[in-house]
Amino acid sequence: MTMVYDSWGANLIRLPINPKYWKNGSVWDEKNLTKEQYQKYIDDMVKAAQARGKYIILDCHRYVMPQQDDLDMWKELAVKYGNNSAVLFGLLNEPHDIKPVGVEKPTTVEQWDVWYNGGQIIVGGEEVTAIGHQQLLNEIRKQGANNICIAGGLNWAFDISGFADGYNERPN
């Protein structure tokens, strides 16, 4: 990270984070990281950015719609890093393949509705409850955090039609 900020002259780094690792630790980089070690790693990255007057995006690096573990992680991150001007929140990395329950071939409008409001979706053949982006944002704000939040469009973030169709005009 030092090289990226100091040698390359970067002003911003996107740090992929995983809610399962945040909650339980992980086997990562051939090391068995505990929850505490994983969270310290993220904290060290945030401190490095802040010490240099740079920025870091904490990027929830999953493609499937947010679920309860994502929401829980964002609540904790909002408390820990809320109003830290070095930290931006990437709510969900490149969402795609949003399949509402009971819909064979979902339209873009149906996918955007789930993106915004959440709902029951199929993931890997199983029904799960998706948390909408508005709920994520609401929970972050309830914790008192005013950090910039980044919300990508559908289909690996290429489809931003929902923003053009009014999702950006809803209260947040």
Model-derived features with residue positions:
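Extracellular glycoside hydrolase catalytic/binding regions
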Residues: 1, 55, 67, 71-81, ...
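Aromatic-lined substrate-binding rim segments of carbohydrate-active enzymes
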Residues: 2-76, 80, 129-143
